[in-house]
Amino acid sequence: VKRALVCAASCLLAVLVLVQPGSAAEPRLVGGVAADQPHAFTAALQTTQGEFFCGGSLVNPSWVVTAAHCVEGRAATSFTVRVGSNDRTQGGELVTPDRLVTHPDYTDTGTGGDIALVHFPAPVQAAPVPLGTATAVGTPVRLLGWGQTCPTPGCGTSPNVLQQLDTQLVDATKCTAPINASVELCTDNPGGNAGACYGDSGGPEVSQVDGHWVLLGVTSRPGNNSSTCATAPSIYTSAVAYAGWINQQLAPPPPPTPTPTPTPTP
């Protein structure tokens, strides 16, 4: 069974995190640091009781993209989403979704398809992040999230403040767990001990293009099937590969076909 980086019950008791984290004086992604700028598009998914469990990215004023495994088995109204704040506990806007769309290729045991969209009943004010267009090996990327900051399950608490880790895309062969290289990205673990961890699932992997952030990936799972975070590169669903599907869901529905008016009988 695919081991995702969503916060499990053991994580929730300690409060959860995002990608494979590392230790330091302050809570952070494994090996990460507190975000050095606002990332209003980063979304924090939490239960209605306030328990954080996954991240996401605002890609449209009414839509957040996250990992399919984050929302599997959940009703849209069973959780809330905070956007527009680097602090997952306050600020920005807190919204209860009204609809979920999971990619039809998703299974909890296979590769690919680990992507879903969360719809809001009304647009939010936070600025969305555009989708990127290229995912070449060697591309510098930034991982963002509130995931666990120590590498073993349930070992620590989730930071309130958004964390970041700068790394790069690497060849798919660096991820030894099953990976679908046509729709998934293998991302390096700097120094062999930094990366995504529990609670980082669904969160953004972004890159800068002409001084602006674009979304390349969605945090999915470890690249080596280990329960200890950041011991190997991690696997991210490619938002670029799924851009067509994302845009199709974001498009407004076509207007209803008008019912022809019957011709009156003379």
Language-model features: locations:
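Protease-domain processing segments flanking chymotrypsin-fold serine proteases, especially trypsin-like
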Residues: 1-65, 73-74, 78-85, 159-160, ...
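Short, solvent-exposed loop/turn segments that connect beta-strands within catalytic domains
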Residues: 50, 88-91, 108-110, 154-155, ...
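Disulfide-rich extracellular modules and peptides
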Residues: 72, 152, 157, 177, ...
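Chymotrypsin/trypsin-fold serine protease catalytic domain
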Residues: 87, 94-95, 100, 112-192, ...
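Active-site region of chymotrypsin-like
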Residues: 37-52, 123-128, 163-203, 209-233
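Active-site-proximal beta-strand/loop segments in catalytic clefts of secreted hydrolases
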Residues: 45-48, 58-61, 67-70, 83-86, ...
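Subtilisin-like serine protease catalytic core
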Residues: 76, 136-138, 156-157, 208-217
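C-terminal subregion of chymotrypsin/trypsin-like serine protease catalytic domains
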Residues: 3, 58-71, 80, 164, ...
